[in-house]
A protein has these predicted regions:
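Positively charged n-region of N-terminal signal peptides that target proteins for export
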Residues: 1-4, 20
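Bacterial Sec-pathway N-terminal export signals of envelope proteins
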Residues: 20-90, 218-219, 256-314, 318, ...
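A glycine-/polar-enriched beta->alpha junction
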Residues: 43-53, 60-75, 126-130, 138-155, ...
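Amphipathic alpha-helical coiled-coil segments
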Residues: 54-69, 171, 177-194, 205, ...
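Small/polar, glycine/serine/threonine/aspartate-rich low-complexity segments that form flexible
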Residues: 80-139, 272-273, 277-282, 331-366
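Sec-dependent N-terminal signal peptides
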Residues: 4-13
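Acidic, low-complexity, intrinsically disordered peripheral segments
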Residues: 6, 78, 85-101, 260-263, ...
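Periplasmic alpha-helical coiled-coil/stalk elements that build and connect Gram-negative outer-membrane
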Residues: 36, 40, 64-66, 166-287, ...
Length: 471
């Protein structure tokens, strides 16, 4: 009879708690706490994460490198200017006129010149020139043939820019994956807290009514102690969840680059945002089609990055060949100098041919090394392409397993609800103990938590699958 009385008091509260646990999570408005959806969290992370900013800076640097390589197609114009003033003339010599006069000329000069002049001709004369001067030139050189180094250098710079873009895409995938993992971890903990709240409400009502029954002498005090022990366990779980929610919220806020809330004392900051939780108990999570239309290894940024590595190795090989070929250039210049206190200008055109000779020996080994590196890149592409296919299949298997686990978790909730209902009836009929009813409640709580974990895991597996097939 006493069990029947208690069961009448508990029946309404049990179903009320079950309804609270099963209701999809939603957040009220007007609380002053900013709410973020999953897409907003990922968008914020993609805009503020340091890895993404670094990858974007790398793209800008690669663009400038490509533009720098493009300038090699145009003439190289250079100007040179020089002024000097030496302590003495740079061109000095001594001339002895007597050594330059033949005997016949000397006899004629002796008849024509005075004695003083003839004596001067016999003395050496010192000549000094170019003590100071000015030189200037303006040159333009246009490469005509450089062994393909300019063309291949530009292609290599373009490959470098493409590589940076692919690396950005990989960074975005990683940031998106991590942000979504944090999001679902926080959502899972908050959903478990909602379950704790519902169970705590149920246990408080059970405690109140069992306490009344004990005072009335229709229930044993042992039943009341069992309820109190379960309440203590729930409070312990609540403390752990509160700490976990706080830590994960801090991690998510920092990773997504959200603005922290400064404390009133100004001694620290914390994140006070919240997330918009999905309805985890709805039956609208359908299994996607395997390897949907357009899915393929060649669409993956990892494969494209390896393909760019092969292309870069091939261009490096061509550059090595070009460095050992003759180079031809033509040019024109305009020059000015004033070395003998006389301004002089002139223009000229020229052509140059540069042929590496001794470099051929070492260059031949460089070419062979580049060929080997190119072959290695091709083999690595083929090997990793197979690994990427395996990753795609593994990701699909993970989605299938997570989906099946989710369906099992949903069925477990239904079975746990029925088990709780039966134990309530058994307790009312006096054929079950309070420990059995509390055990049924615990099984229901565990089923809800497993469903929450299964739902979060399914969402993470879906993202991994989309990234694995290049979507």
């Amino acid at each position: 009879m006493k069990n029947y009385i208690i069961s009448l008091l508990l029946s309404a509260f049990v179903f009320s708690a079950l309804a609270q646990v099963s209701t999809p999570l939603s957040l009220g408005e007007g609380s002053g706490v900013r709410l973020y959806t999953l897409e907003q969290i990922k968008d914020s992370a993609l805009h503020n994460n340091i890895a993404i900013r670094h990858a974007r800076h790398s793209i800008e640097a690669a663009k400038e490198q490509r533009k720098e390589a493009f300038t090699k197609y145009f003439p190289n114009v250079s100007g040179t200017g020089l002024w000097f003033n030496a302590n003495k003339g740079m061109a000095q010599t001594t001339v002895n006129p007597s050594e330059m006069i033949s005997p016949e000329l000397g006899a004629s000069l002796a008849q024509m010149l005075p004695v003083e002049a003839l004596a001067a001709l016999s003395n050496p004369i010192s000549i000094s020139m170019m003590k100071n001067g000015t030189i200037g030139s303006l040159m333009a050189v246009q490469p005509v043939f450089a062994g393909g180094q300019i063309v291949n250098g530009n292609k290599l710079a373009k490959v470098g820019e493409d590589v940076r873009r692919l690396q950005l895409q990989l960074s975005e995938n990683e940031v998106e994956k991590t942000a979504e993992q944090y999001f679902w971890q926080l959502a899972s903990l908050q959903e478990k807290m909602k379950t704790i709240d519902a169970v705590d409400t149920l246990l408080r009502d059970i405690h109140k009514d069992v306490d009344v029954a004990v005072l009335a002498g229709v229930a044993m005090r042992n039943d009341l102690l069992q309820v109190q022990l379960r309440q203590n366990d729930i409070q312990s779980q609540r403390l752990k969840l509160q700490n976990g929610i706080s830590i994960v919220r801090q991690l998510l806020g920092q990773y997504a680059g959200l603005t922290p809330h400064q404390s009133s004392t100004g001694e620290g900051s914390s994140y006070s945002f919240d997330i918009v939780l999905p309805a985890m108990n709805q039956q609208d999570n359908l299994l996607p089609s395997p390897f949907g239309e357009g899915a393929g290894v060649k669409l993956l940024p990892e494969y494209q990055l390896l393909d760019k590595q092969v292309e870069a190795a091939n261009l490096q090989k061509k550059l090595a060949v070009g460095q050992n070929l003759p180079s031809v250039a033509v040019g024109a210049g305009y020059n000015y100098h004033n070395l003998l206190d006389n301004n002089h200008t002139f223009g000229m055109v020229f052509a140059t041919v540069s042929v590496p000779i001794s470099d051929w020996w070492g260059g031949s080994h460089t070419i062979k090394r580049r060929k080997i590196e190119h072959q290695q890149a091709q083999e690595q592409l083929e090997d990793n392409a197979e690994l990427l296919k395996i990753r795609m299949q593994n990701a699909w298997n993970g989605v299938q397993e997570a989906y099946q686990q989710l369906q099992l978790a949903r069925r477990s909730i239904e079975q746990a609800e029925e088990n709780l209902r039966l134990n309530r009836n058994y307790y009312r009929a006096g054929t079950s103990r309070m420990s059995d009813l509390l055990e049924a409640q615990l099984l229901y709580q565990q089923s809800c938590d497993k469903h929450t974990d299964a739902f979060a895991d399914y969402q993470n597996k879906l993202l991994e699958y989309r990234q694995a097939i290049g979507r």
